[in-house]
């Protein structure tokens, strides 16, 4: 996570949001906040590819200067998190960004992604 301009409180909120999303879903989450160069999508793909376990990781890239937001899911993560769910989380984050709440938007978006990817509990009904 790149957060040179973030306060300690903001950094802590984002780290907590990442940990909660991971706890809910069993996936790994990575957040990049900063400059994404000329092509945010290509940058997100490159960053995702450099992660320790890209197959099981969801990368959220946010470049406030370029108004760019990218969500990249690894091959295994994609089994638990659909493109539509990522789009819904992105729309939610963007709504917060427009209202001037970058940290809240990222935190809530990560929570949404973690919730969408939550592993379902299998309930067995005993006939009797």
Regions found by a protein language model. Name each.
Residues 1-57, 64-128:
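A structural boundary signal for the start of the first folded domain, especially the loop/turn
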């Amino acid at each position: 996570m790149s957060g040179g301009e973030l306060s300690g409180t903001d950094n802590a909120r984002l780290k907590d949001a990442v940990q909660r999303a991971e706890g809910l879903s069993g996936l790994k989450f990575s957040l990049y906040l900063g400059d994404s160069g000329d092509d945010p999508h290509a940058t997100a793909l490159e960053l995702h590819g450099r992660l320790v376990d890209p197959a099981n990781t969801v990368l959220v890239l946010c470049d406030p200067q370029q108004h760019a937001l990218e969500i990249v899911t690894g091959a295994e993560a994609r089994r638990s998190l659909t493109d539509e769910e990522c789009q819904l989380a992105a729309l939610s984050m963007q709504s917060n960004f427009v209202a001037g709440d970058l940290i809240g938007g990222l935190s809530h978006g990560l929570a949404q992604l973690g919730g969408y990817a939550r592993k379902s509990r299998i309930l067995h009904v005993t006939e009797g």
